[in-house]
Amino acid sequence: MTYANPHLLWSVDELKDHVQDPNLVLLDMRPPEAYSNEHIPSARSFDIFGISLIDTRPEPLEAFLWMMEHLIQGKGVNSDSNVVVYDDIAGMRSARLFWFLEFFGHDAVHILNGGFNAWRDAGFPITQQAMVPKGGNFKMKPRRERIATVDDVLEKLHRPSTVIVDARSDAEYTGQLVRAKHGGAIPGAVHLEWTNNLDSKGFFKSAAELKQMYAERDITPDKEVIPHCQGAYRSAHTYVALRLLGYPNVRNYLGSWGEWGNRGDLPIEHPSEP
C-alpha cells in the first residue's frame, strides 16, 4: 500500500537531486543554534516555534495570519517557489509550516522525510554557512477548509460526522499535566499522540500502518477530522499524516489547548488514564 499523496514527502535523495534548483526554497525549522552548528547547504533558518495564537476569533486571527504571511515573505518564498521544510526528524516543527503553507494556498510544499538526521546519516554535504535570503512575493490565499477556529470546534462537538483528535501526551490529555489555566480535554476528543505517526528513526510510518492505526480509533476518511494539541504543532503533524493517507477533510485547530484551556466558558472533560 502506498500513500495517497506521496508527493507531500521528499526523501533525502530527492532533495539532493534538487537542492541547487533556482526555484527551491529550503527552510530549516530547527532552533537557530542547531542551524548555526550544521545545516543542509542553501537552507534558510526559520524558527517560528515560539509564535502561536491563543485567540482564533476573527480579528486576532486575521492579524496573526498577516504576520505569518510577512514572515514567510521574509524568507524569500515566492508564489511559485517549491518549498521543502525540515527539522531534526520528520517532526512537528516542519509539519506546522507545511500546514500553514497548504492553508495559505501554496501547494508546492514538501516535508523532508527523516529530517536533517536522515540527510546527515546519508553522508550528504552539510555546512555552517548561513543563507541570507532576499524578500519574496508570497501572498496568502487562505483556504478556510484547512483551519478550525474555536467556534468551529464548538459547533462540531459531539457530531458523529466529525472527530476531534487530541495529539497531546497522555498526561496532558488526562489533565495530570496542565499547560493552561485549565487541564483536561475537549469533550469527546479521541486521543492519539502525534509521535505514533513516526517510526523509531523519525520517518513517517508506512501508509498501511498509519491507515490501520487511525481506523482502529474510528478516525476514518468519511469524517471531518479536527486535530489539536497545545499550539497547533503536534496537531499539524497529525494533519500531515492524514493528508498523506488522502483524507479529504482535515482542519488543524490553530488555537488548540492554548486557547481552549485558557478560557473559562468552554466545556472540558477529564478522561481517565488511557
Task: Provide a role label for each language-model segment.
Residues 1-274:
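Cytosolic catalytic domains that perform sulfur/thiol-centered chemistry
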